[in-house]
């Protein structure tokens, strides 16, 4: 199955999401990449998702809490260099997905996490991001890591494992890359994205 995503001229509307951790991480991150405001309803308030929310705030997004189920993320049109290191807490999803976004920015970011997260492997996203041109400083592919944002180039990546985090990371990176980024698993094209 081939899926190609091209940039739309305009995207408007409302989506009500279930209180799902995986969807919430991605909703927060995609909202951070928009030009304008996004309202998110019924988001997960788990610690991992709150780590993602805190990080996008540190990157310049403004968060307005409407009530206990709704918030608005105002991305202010562009991410900004963080003043402090970004704390991913215990969230591997936060670390891997935000790496895809940060790799294509025009600033340097530092990611760290708790003791448990600092033992978990990040090679599965660092390797393909480096193939796209990203620059990392790390200790054996583990946190803490420094990401030196740069202009990325699209790649055709054959993944040795099926991982939603790797797919999401590379598709997020592909949004800021020159050309087309394709992710293949077992020679089956799962996803591709072309930036403009």
Predicted regions and their residues:
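Structural preference for solvent-exposed beta-strand-turn elements
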Residues: 1-196
